[in-house]
Amino acid sequence: MSAEGAGPVPSDHADRIRWNAKWAAGSAPSFTPHLLAVRALALDLPDGPVADLACGPSGSVLLAAAQGRRVTAVDVSEVALGLLGEEARRRGLVRQVTMVHADLAAWSPEPGSYALVLCIGFWDAGVFAAAAAAVADGGLLAWEALTAEARRAHPDLPSAWCLAPGEPASLLPPGFGVLDQSEVPGRNRRRLLARRASSIQ
């Protein structure tokens, strides 16, 4: 596993400990691609790799790799990345996938380097800004995260982990067009699909 643009994750990192425990104790992952990833990968995309942030054992990574894309899979849990790597190897896709064990807050992707940046179930405004900057001309940014409504059911959930009204579309930098932003019915989540304009006219 590499640490592209990031330092090592400390052994006492709270999220690392929590997610390692979850994936170590849980049942085998289904590796079903997320619907937002399926939709994004079916659209017109420029050449180039895909990044899946806070990926877990992601079927979306495997789908992109099976379509011939090189994929960067970033997660704070090496247990999750290990499960994903085993499945990629089983499917003959391991050479397509780069595992990055990193805290996303410390991960610094190269600007304009990805045809698609995907993130499901995680929110941090700073990470969102870095992810948007990493999208290539003509590429897509696909994001799904909890909304503030989730705090009604889970009052201890930090507000910084939840989307405010209008987000994340309202935080897109200039040059992006929103293809869709919508609520996920019954999930207290919101999805965004946005495209960076191409510089080629």
Where in this protein do the model-derived segments appear?
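Conserved SAM-binding motif I beta-strand of class I
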Residues: 70-75
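Conserved class I S-adenosyl-L-methionine
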Residues: 1-45
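Conserved SAM-binding loop of SAM-dependent methyltransferases across substrates and taxa
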Residues: 57-67
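Conserved beta-strand signature within the Rossmann-like core of class I S-adenosyl-L-methionine
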Residues: 139-146
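A short acidic, Gly/Pro-enriched loop at the edge of an enzyme's catalytic core
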Residues: 109-116
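A short, conserved alpha-helix within the catalytic core of class I
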Residues: 123-134
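Conserved SAM-binding strand-loop segment of SAM-dependent methyltransferases
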Residues: 92-104
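Conserved SAM/SAH-binding beta-strand->alpha-helix loop
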Residues: 77-79
